[in-house]
A protein has these predicted regions:
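Secondary-structure junction motif
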Residues: 94-100, 141-143, 175, 183-211, ...
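Short helix-boundary/capping micro-motifs
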Residues: 2-20
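Alpha-helical linker/hinge and terminal dimerization helices associated
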Residues: 34-35, 56-78, 85, 93, ...
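Hydrophobic hinge/microswitch elements
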Residues: 127-131, 137, 196-253
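Flexible hinge/capping segments at coil-to-helix
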Residues: 149-191
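A short LG(V/I)-centered, amphipathic sequence patch enriched
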Residues: 30-51
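Central regulatory/effector-binding core of bacterial HTH transcription factors
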Residues: 81-145, 220
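Beta-alpha-beta core module
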Residues: 152-158, 163, 224-273
Length: 290
């Protein structure tokens, strides 16, 4: 079931698993019948998970991971391999905390995943139990919509820190010497933001004040691209200012933005699941940046 979901096609999953397509189709139908839910919707392009299917797959992943741990320990006599996955918005401090987690984790066998992704995908990853924890922010602008989604997905948000907005730009930028900036100061320059796929709205934006009109907009998918565009085209982005050196560089600075808004950055987990030991270590590492 997991492979079918990952491939988005029963035919492709059958090829990957070296079994016949009819056999796999029958197996999927049998699981759906026994579970009493429709896990996949079928179409010409392949298959897609239903809402019930997403929940089913989340539990299925947990079962498979536990079986792998049992097999490694009691059959292969290997030390268990721990898995820990974080889905996060594009923050440097989440990466630094992840590095600290790995440095503190002494076992030889592990699978750690740091997934910088879109806001809605963070919620989906945690909901489907692909990720143990998700990192995102809430503000006056997005709180109502995100809170509704958290309720729908049975997730809980825990605030870690509260930050004031800062403008990130290159050290040689015409505005770099200003001690404080206003939104109107930024109008002549390209606004840089992260793409949100099918959820391009202020409610899922990683940047504050995304509804404020801008003549020049550039959207990217990763932090390295944003840094290059800040330097190459004198663009800017608005973020927390918690850790002002993107990618450990000295070319980018942050300047406080004189606007009445705050970013409440926190973590998201499933309501029915407590933080694991690795989760607690990671959260403690995040708290150091408050």
């Amino acid at each position: 079931m997991i492979t079918v979901a990952e491939k988005g096609s029963i035919t492709e999953a059958a090829k990957f698993l070296f079994i016949s397509q009819p056999s796999l189709s029958d197996a999927v139908r049998q699981v759906e019948k026994e579970a009493g839910v429709t896990i996949f919707t079928r179409c010409r392009a392949g298959v897609a998970l239903t809402k019930e299917g997403m929940e089913f797959l989340g539990y299925a992943r947990q079962v498979v991971q536990q079986m792998e741990l049992l097999e490694a320990k009691y059959i292969n006599n290997e030390p268990p391999r721990q898995r820990f996955c974080v889905s996060t918005q594009h923050y440097t401090f989440t990466t630094n905390a992840f590095v600290e987690l790995i440095q503190k984790f002494g076992q030889e066998r592990f699978e750690f995943i740091l997934n910088e992704t879109q806001t809605h995908q963070i919620l989906e990853d945690v909901r489907n139990r692909f990720s143990d924890i998700g990192i995102l922010y809430m503000s006056q602008e997005n709180e109502s919509v995100l809170t509704k989604l958290l309720e729908e997905y049975d997730l809980q948000f825990y605030e870690l820190l509260c930050a004031s907005p800062h403008v990130f730009l290159r050290r040689g930028h015409p505005l770099a010497q200003r001690p404080l900036l206003k939104l109107e100061d930024l109008k002549p320059y390209p606004r840089l933001s992260f793409v949100q796929g099918n959820y391009e709205s202020a409610y899922f934006s990683e940047e504050l004040f995304s509804t404020v009109p801008a003549e020049k907009n550039i959207k990217v998918s990763d932090r390295a691209a944003i840094v290059n565009l800040m330097i190459g085209v004198s663009g800017y982005t608005i973020s927390s200012g918690i850790f002002p050196k993107y990618l450990q560089g000295d070319d980018i600075i942050s300047i406080p933005l004189d606007e009445q808004e705050t970013m409440r950055i926190g973590y998201v987990i499933n309501r029915d699941k407590e933080l694991s030991e690795l989760g607690r270590i990671y959260v403690e590492a995040l708290k150091k940046f408050r």
